[in-house]
Amino acid sequence: MTDKKTVKVKLVRSPIGTKESHRATVRGLGLRQIGSERVLEDTPAVRGMINKVSYLVQVL
């Protein structure tokens, strides 16, 4: 068992009508439809992805 830090992310707005790169980032986070949640490893790369689409997601 490792003690890796995690972050829980929820998609709260639709990526329709956003930039293609932002839609790809949402998919990269593993989020598909509004309300979907993922628990991800808390790394600088994941934090950067969350920051890029912060207007679409919510950190729980």
UniProtKB/Swiss-Prot annotation:
Please give the Gene3D superfamilies that the UniProt record associates with this protein: Ribosomal protein L30, ferredoxin-like fold domain
GO MF terms listed in the record are: structural constituent of ribosome
Q: Name one GO cellular component term.
A: cytosolic large ribosomal subunit
Q: What is the lineage of its organism?
A: Bacteria, Pseudomonadati, Pseudomonadota, Betaproteobacteria, Burkholderiales
Checking HAMAP family in the record gives:
Ribosomal_uL30_B
- Species in which this protein is naturally found: Methylibium petroleiphilum (strain ATCC BAA-1232 / LMG 22953 / PM1)
The entry's protein name is: Large ribosomal subunit protein uL30
Name of the gene encoding the protein in the UniProt record:
rpmD
Please tell me whether the keyword Ribosomal protein is annotated for this protein.
Answer: yes
Q: Which UniProt keywords apply?
A: Ribonucleoprotein, Ribosomal protein
List this protein's GO terms for biological process.
Answer: translation
